[in-house]
């Protein structure tokens, strides 16, 4: 164990401080496509019975009208987070009217690009802005790529913990800056070690052959309708032939919060010639919010983000600049197609131990390690189960299995501390399950997906539809209690009323609204 990690764990293990570890906050966002009874993309509007996608706090859409997004409230116990997520699934399933929630991350058979419906948010200015932003994504990256679904894991350490560490370490930074620097250090370590999550939880080794739209790739054919890589863990997180040159130079290495903010500010205000050629309007219709490298900060694609809850009308980068980092959002997790929620308690508890390990371990600046971190991540998503696979650690080759076992040995200390804080051995058990996967790659979700498809002679689509139907049956057999169902019905109707009120009471025209939105980031830069 590193000196810094051991010192911090000893400090938090003291009787007076141990309860702090029960105050970490969790939230999960799960995306999933709606499909029809044949497993084709649902072309129906977002079900009105689920409420307004603009104003509902827990049920919205991501890119497409058919790409649902379920958002849990924050909880200190991740078991409560998963219970929240299950309630949302049960309610949504009860309103789908013959449609299913698609079980894996990679999409079903998709119609042609033009027919994939972009999510709609009504006629309010903010609703229209969200729609035009998505039109811009279609223009820049194509609609097909936007139909990939994932799980986002939001995690924060208790606010009371940072002053304790700051004082113990004699830091001269302000409390806010110390906290931000600590989260950025967590993110640097996440970049170093997130390949391990791809090995353990990657669950997208195969996809529907039509997804590539005929483009050449390194993928092999499993059957007439399925492409795969034999040792892949997460094709979702690989490049899959998508190279967006505009974002190529955008690689913040997270040396400090300010440099991260500056790189995003620059990207959302720097014109990109190919986008300038298109312009923001065609035939008088908006096609993208601006012609810059990024339309808004959230367009930047990354496996983890520093976050701060925003105020109404505030942009993410404004919130970070004004109040510092509050939590991290892990964005690289595949949906496990064998699980009704796409994630379970073992995975969540391991993630907690992993993120605490990243937060408390020494985290030097990445600098030269940046390219190694990227290369390791890409190697594992494409061939993580290849026997003897070598990764790069501080410029030296190391076998994945050796490095993974060393990391799990160190993460065991944070898992043990979490168990001491909460009682029981749940985190140690979650860690043991991951050790078993390192010892035997056949136990990983990616290997299990290929094993089942081969044993049953199923295409990716057939496997996924069967899993989707099984999960629908699970939710049907576990309906919400009447009181819970009524609470969700009210949330849906309240959100519709809120959207109606927003549309009725707004002032101003859309062009002025977009100009003001753009000016908010330009104002930040000039300050």
Swiss-Prot record:
<keyword id="KW-0547">Nucleotide-binding</keyword>
<protein>
    <recommendedName>
        <fullName>Glutamate--cysteine ligase</fullName>
        <ecNumber>6.3.2.2</ecNumber>
    </recommendedName>
</protein>
<dbReference type="GO" id="GO:0005524">
    <property type="term" value="F:ATP binding"/>
</dbReference>
<dbReference type="InterPro" id="IPR006334">
    <property type="entry name" value="Glut_cys_ligase"/>
</dbReference>
<dbReference type="GO" id="GO:0005829">
    <property type="term" value="C:cytosol"/>
</dbReference>
<dbReference type="InterPro" id="IPR014746">
    <property type="entry name" value="Gln_synth/guanido_kin_cat_dom"/>
</dbReference>
<keyword id="KW-0317">Glutathione biosynthesis</keyword>
<dbReference type="GO" id="GO:0006750">
    <property type="term" value="P:glutathione biosynthetic process"/>
</dbReference>
<keyword id="KW-0436">Ligase</keyword>
<dbReference type="InterPro" id="IPR007370">
    <property type="entry name" value="Glu_cys_ligase"/>
</dbReference>
<keyword id="KW-0067">ATP-binding</keyword>
<dbReference type="GO" id="GO:0046872">
    <property type="term" value="F:metal ion binding"/>
</dbReference>
<dbReference type="Pfam" id="PF04262">
    <property type="entry name" value="Glu_cys_ligase"/>
</dbReference>
<comment type="pathway">
    <text>Sulfur metabolism; glutathione biosynthesis; glutathione from L-cysteine and L-glutamate: step 1/2.</text>
</comment>
<comment type="similarity">
    <text>Belongs to the glutamate--cysteine ligase type 1 family. Type 1 subfamily.</text>
</comment>
<dbReference type="GO" id="GO:0004357">
    <property type="term" value="F:glutamate-cysteine ligase activity"/>
</dbReference>
